[in-house]
Amino acid sequence: ELNQIIASQDLEIVVAAMVGIAGLKPVFQAIKHGKHILLANKESYVVAGEILNNLSKKTGATIFPIDSEHSAIHQCLMGVKNEESISRLILTGSGGPFLNRDINDFKNITPKEATAHPIWNMGDKISVDSSTMMNKCLEIIEAKWLFGFDDIDVLIHPEGIIHSLIEFKDKSLIAQLSIPDMKIPIAYGLGFP
């Protein structure tokens, strides 16, 4: 059973990459057992971020995001000495497959078009969420709980090279840039620290 595997003393890292709310119970169990969690299941933090954060403080579990945007924010924060100097977090999004489509033509959108993400190769649910920008809404909520910031904005960046930025009160920025390849944030998470 999954709970027994998660509780095992031999298990150090849990990769939580299941889709939807189904990820909440395994993420909760991994935190309960003090594991190092590579998190790609945003829904668990959207619905229970405060609870999961409080539990991780008690158990010593670490939550490391492996979504490209959240991994990028994590990397940017590593270079920040004073978080009070931060003005806002900026997540990027491609704008989805309909960014330049005439709004009057939206009624003709097909399911096949809605699942054809211009940058990332993803499953149908997250592709549809991305095509409607709903995925970005979920990522904003997740970022709030992962990083403790309320001022979070979105920048449409169709090329997918800039993954996230941090803006400081003096209006300077730091960003994480890379080719759009999920192997990069996953490898970073596996190798951190």
Please describe what each predicted stretch is:
Residues 1-193:
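Catalytic, metal-anchored helix/loop core of enzyme active sites in primary metabolism
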